[in-house]
Amino acid sequence: MAIRVYKPTTAGRRNASVSDFSELTRSTPEKSLVRKKSKTGGRNSYGRITSRHRGGGHKRQYRLIDFKRWDKDGVPAKVAEIEYDPNRSARIALLHFADGEKRYIIAPKGIKQGDVIETGAQADIKPGNNLPLKNIPTGTVVHAIELRPLGGAKIARSAGAAVQLVAKDGAYAQLRMPSGEIRNVDARCRATVGEVGNEDHANIQLGKAGRARWIGRRPITRGESMNPVDHPHGGRTRGGKPPVSPWGKGEVRTRRPKKASNKMIVRRRPSGKNRK
């Protein structure tokens, strides 16, 4: 992937950049692997906003991605197409399996049209192959990792994401996350070799507010610029208050302190002065 930077012909073009999409081989999705995707505007079933700053944006169709792959052990697949997916930052690859079935997977870095991909404990260690962590050598970079055996990939699915297998200890494998955290995962969990492609996605500059609206992001308004009825910071009276949310709550941790998976964390992610 490469990034195309626009010339500053207008204010909205200045510093704006976009992917050149040179790695894509097809512009329309596989019809049998597409489903309707309805918009919520960040509202729940009661119509109340539960996720702020969402709404609008271009219509999308959901592509069915295979995050499990364990039911295709021993069945080789050929990479037929590399496609764009509006629902995620990574590209997706269309696989044609030897038994005639077609499926989408997250496209790993370096994969190309015509490559053959394998699934199962006996698969080779090469990008795109999916196998249990216990069968992957220490030091290998992986992505699309399960948290529980046969639970489907949950970790490292976005563009450029990569996790390193740093050790194996009995029934567990130790993974170094993108955040720097090291945690244990059941060694029977599956992972895909390599890192996720489209790694330059983080370097793209939208350049103007309109491009944010195209992808469904609404503006963020400061509480201080609101009226008192809308936010505790609203109104002209300034100072004397600690920062709070629109509902008057101070800063709180978002992770439950007694979460069951805490015991799987070997070393927490660096924070504050320790963050590199």
Curated annotation (Swiss-Prot):
Extent of Polar residues compositional bias: 16-27
Listed Gene3D superfamilies: 2.30.30.30, Nucleic acid-binding proteins, Ribosomal protein L2, domain 3
UniProt-annotated stretches for the region Disordered: 14-58, 219-276
Keywords attached to this entry: Ribonucleoprotein, Ribosomal protein, RNA-binding, rRNA-binding
InterPro entries recorded: NA-bd_OB-fold, Rib_uL2_dom2, Ribosomal_uL2, Ribosomal_uL2_bac/org-type, Ribosomal_uL2_C, Ribosomal_uL2_dom3, Ribosomal_uL2_RNA-bd_dom, Translation_prot_SH3-like_sf
GO molecular function term, any single one: structural constituent of ribosome
Gene Ontology terms: biological process: cytoplasmic translation
Pfam families with a match to the protein in the record: Ribosomal_L2 (PF00181), Ribosomal_L2_C (PF03947)
Subunit composition and interactions: Part of the 50S ribosomal subunit. Forms a bridge to the 30S subunit in the 70S ribosome.
Function summary: One of the primary rRNA binding proteins. Required for association of the 30S and 50S subunits to form the 70S ribosome, for tRNA binding and peptide bond formation. It has been suggested to have peptidyltransferase activity; this is somewhat controversial. Makes several contacts with the 16S rRNA in the 70S ribosome.
Name of the featured protein: Large ribosomal subunit protein uL2
Species for this entry: Bifidobacterium longum (strain NCC 2705)
